[in-house]
Design a protein with these regions (language model features):
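Amphipathic, Lys/Arg-enriched alpha-helical "gate/interface" segment within cytosolic domains
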Residues: 1-126
């Protein structure tokens, strides 16, 4: 299964970053691919959904995520997370702080996709 792939929801293209069940090593490898794909897209053009359901973290994986999130910021219009309960709070807060981005959390992919492709960005889950 490709961990980084484009899907369509409500006629809009969304980059799905599927970390579900990943180990820290897999997260680091996937983030290399995320950086390559996202930085090749036009500025402020991407909708991204990252699924962290059942993911294992360590500091090096979390550090790689925050660096890529900072580099990707100019290309991402909206980003959402699913399975964020797998991310230790300290890593989640460091991710947002370092990248100067907000990552709304959703319970399901469907909820996240509806928010990403909807017009109302104010109704984000937390």
């Amino acid at each position: 299964m490709e961990r980084v792939r484009f899907i369509t929801h409500r006629g809009k293209r969304v980059l799905l970053i599927d970390h579900a069940g990943s180990t820290p090593d897999e997260i680091r490898r996937t983030m290399d691919e995320v950086e390559r794909v996202v930085t090749s897209e036009p500025p402020n053009s991407l909708l991204t959904l990252s699924d962290f359901t059942g993911t294992e973290f360590d500091k090096t994986a979390a550090d790689r995520m925050k660096v890529v999130a900072a580099k990707d910021r100019p290309h991402v219009r909206r980003a959402a997370l699913v399975g964020a309960e797998s991310i230790p709070d300290v890593y989640y807060h460091n991710l947002e702080s370092f990248s100067a981005r907000h990552f709304p959390k959703f319970k399901t992919r469907e909820e996240a996709l509806d928010w990403l492709t909807g017009e109302d960005t104010e109704a984000a889950a937390s």
